[in-house]
């Protein structure tokens, strides 16, 4: 792939990511107490998309043939870890708002940034051969992070289904939240595929960045559609409805 073609394709794909993030930031959300954490989740998702788009544009200034490519891999691993944290918390807050607090998010972010800072320090201070061992260890930690977030999501999803089962039929719950499961599993697949970016291969970079742009556009659409399911999810989560109401239309009428 020629330098000019690579540059153009990466700029287009990265520009689409930035545009998706900006459009998501402009989406209006209900201005009420129940939607407060939904707005926070939207901000987290917006930040994750913009973070990747801007990083890909900045990465174009790196020399892929020089030693600085290792620094690019460090930053790519850091971006992937932060994105995994943001996406997971954005999904979790929609099914278990009490599990996502500012303190927990900052704690997770602090641990991720500490590990990434140590990795960059190893790149600067240690011989290249030694640094590569540290880098491989950080890749293993990243995979462990994805496994941990998957376990967290599955546990809270089971709790959520048990919590709302008193209010709605199982089919209605599954139909309303099907997209949320798709969102998480696609995000997990993206997190795994992000490891391919560490190969520093131009063709892989272009293909994966284009795929990420499509996936994140899908994420944004799903996230916007969540507002249609909010009458189902939020009242049950916050226990604002005292009597069991097993019909979405009846519940909506009750809340209005």
State where each predicted segment sits.
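Short alpha-helix boundary/capping motifs
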Residues: 119-120, 185
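Transmembrane helix-loop junctions and nearby membrane-interface residues
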Residues: 22-29, 56-64, 88, 94, ...
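Alpha-helical transmembrane segments and their membrane-interface exit regions
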Residues: 80-87, 144-148, 214-221
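Alpha-helical transmembrane segments and their immediate juxtamembrane interface regions
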Residues: 92-105, 212-237
